[in-house]
Amino acid sequence: GIEMLRETGLLERIMPELLEGYGVEQKLFHHDDVYHHLLNTCDVAPDNIKLAALFHDIGKPRTDMHNGHFYGHDTEGEKITREIMQRLKFPNAEIDRVARLVRNHMFFFPYTEDGMSQEQIDVINEKAWTDSAVRRFIARVGEENVDDLFALRIADASANPKTAFQPKEVEELQKRISEVRAKDMVIKVTDLVINGEDLMSIGFVAGPQIGIVLNELLELVLDDPMLNTREKLLEIASQKIIK
């Protein structure tokens, strides 16, 4: 369908951003140009992530270093994705879901395998994700989007015979996430034991500062879940009251 739109000239009117990838070589770990890789990934992706698959590398033409690297294409891709979907009048929730998948599809999770030397294992262990890193990953992606992100990563690899990606990376990260999920996990503001009313009870005035402070508290709790008690959070928050 997308290719037919291109051949008839309609794609330029509907999603000209996709055409930017036509003929843009990826070298290194890709066989197709950006445009055809996006179409191929969309073809193999499950229905619920086809849009994310179609857009996941859409930022590459604007970040092309002309040496096979596209630094920041995930961030640029998120921006373009939001622009396209807003223009096409998608619901805000769907725009945010797809944009998050595009923004985070380049994750890298280090893991060890049998047969590795001790030196290799030591290097990987130095890069191991802490519980805090896992919580931040989930918070960034959205807990409800994690499985879709894994499906996107697998579709991306399936559409590219030259990929260096190994499915075990997803399997190992899934295990790590399960370990963290089994603990008391705080990944969003509503998981905190206090809310805006609690902040107002100690002197905060209703307004933007409440949201700002709650997000600052969340950042602290992502690093140290032991801080997620009413007493500790209110003590920290009390130091942020604007007199």
Outline where the language-model segments fall.
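Conserved, hydrophobic alpha-helical core segments of structured domains
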Residues: G1-F165
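Charged substrate- and nucleic-acid-binding regions of tRNA-handling and nucleotidyl-transfer enzymes
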Residues: E83, R87, A157-K243
